[in-house]
Amino acid sequence: MPSTREIRRRIRSVKNLAQITRAMEMVSASKMRRAQRNVLATRPYADRLLDVMGELTGRAVGMRRGTLLEVRPVVKGVALIVVTPDRGLAGSLVANVLRRASRFILDEQEKKHTVEVLAIGKKGRDFMVRTRQNLVAEVTKLGDYPRLTDILGIATNVINGFLSGRYDEVYVLYSQFVNTLVQRPTIKRLLPIDPPHEPAERMVDYTYEPSQEEVLRALLPRFVEVQLYQAVLEAIASEHSARMVAMRNATDNAKELQRDLTLSYNKTRQANITKEVSEIASGAAALAEM
């Protein structure tokens, strides 16, 4: 049985750990709220951009070939953008995303497709290197509040790759923020773009300058960039949410362990007192018999 001194030392250690995890929980909660606001702030722009593209593609018939709208009959090259955190301590979030990435890559390889991976985040980058996947680009250290310009390199890479024929399809894998307790690994196709088509009776007769085709060609890359940026923001909100929950669970477990150790300490202390009293009583009885 451990001594009372050893148990007291363990109680202090667990108490200090609980204070650390509680502080990390509070920090993650604050960052999660700001990350959620960032996600919501981008949605009006993305929704309006989607509406305009639906209007334009409905009018610019036959403009798919040679653009980011072109659906190719035979798929040979596939790009997968994997969005993960730079840091751990986020529960099973990273493992779930990487497990989904491995399954996607395996499925595409079984179809005889060449898969190239572009990693956003250290965890995904390290996993792809460790498993010897075809990693062609990486972006790390985006921080908690990345800007659109931070992901333009990756976006430009896949856009140029698609237009050159290197990629026939481009996907992004990220952790979708559902709510504080649920973050879902999600794969979304970025390219070719499949915008909604407005019914003819709902179309408004806008005038576009210099032309509908030119405006559409300019908007298509912006749409890909915004979609990728939204995926990154969703992943960051999911990361902070998962870390907050993980740290809360760690704090609760530490407090429970502290209670168990305190109970063990009291039992050990009581046993020592009982032993000392018994020894004193035995000594007194021995003296009385002399």
Swiss-Prot record:
GO terms for biological process: proton motive force-driven plasma membrane ATP synthesis. It is found in: Cell membrane. Keywords: ATP synthesis, Cell membrane, CF(1), Hydrogen ion transport, Ion transport, Membrane, Transport. SUPFAM superfamilies: ATP synthase (F1-ATPase), gamma subunit (SSF52943). It is a peripheral membrane protein. It comes from the Bacteria. GO terms for molecular function: ATP binding; proton-transporting ATP synthase activity, rotational mechanism. Pfam families: ATP-synt (PF00231). One of its GO terms (cellular component) is plasma membrane. NCBIfam families: ATPsyn_F1gamma, PRK14111.1. Produces ATP from ADP in the presence of a proton gradient across the membrane. The gamma chain is believed to be important in regulating ATPase activity and the flow of protons through the CF(0) complex. Belongs to the ATPase gamma chain family. F-type ATPases have 2 components, CF(1) - the catalytic core - and CF(0) - the membrane proton channel. CF(1) has five subunits: alpha(3), beta(3), gamma(1), delta(1), epsilon(1). CF(0) has three main subunits: a, b and c. This is ATP synthase gamma chain. The lineage of its organism: Bacteria, Bacillati, Chloroflexota, Chloroflexia, Chloroflexales. The gene is atpG.
